[in-house]
Swiss-Prot record:
Short name of one Pfam family: YozE_SAM_like
Signal peptide positions on this chain: none
Ranges annotated as spanning the membrane: none
SUPFAM superfamilies: YozE-like (SSF140652)
Organism this protein belongs to: Limosilactobacillus reuteri (strain DSM 20016)
Record-linked InterPro entries: UPF0346, YozE_SAM-like, YozE_SAM-like_sf
Lineage: Bacteria, Bacillati, Bacillota, Bacilli, Lactobacillales
Listed name of the protein: UPF0346 protein Lreu_0775
UniProt similarity note: Belongs to the UPF0346 family.
Length: 73
């Protein structure tokens, strides 16, 4: 069974890291409205653009999404 993007992102958490994807994961953990079951790029991207003040650049999401795709293949 394929994991959701959120489930993958939680594997990237590291509160002591300066890596932007890991910081994104740390912040998403505390986002109670994050679409936790989604595997859809457009749905998650739209959500982040509208709601994620903790994400300074969408290029961080793009990098995290690429890591997700690589891990799922």
């Amino acid at each position: 069974m394929r994991m959701s993007f959120y489930q993958f992102l939680m594997t990237q958490r590291n509160p002591n890291s300066a890596d932007e994807v890991q910081q994104f994961a740390n912040n998403a953990f505390f986002d109670t409205t994050f679409p936790k079951h989604s595997e859809d790029f457009d749905e998650i991207s739209h959500y982040l653009e509208e709601n994620a003040d903790y994400l300074p650049s969408m290029t961080i999401f793009d990098e995290a999404w690429q890591r997700y795709i690589d891990a799922m293949n």
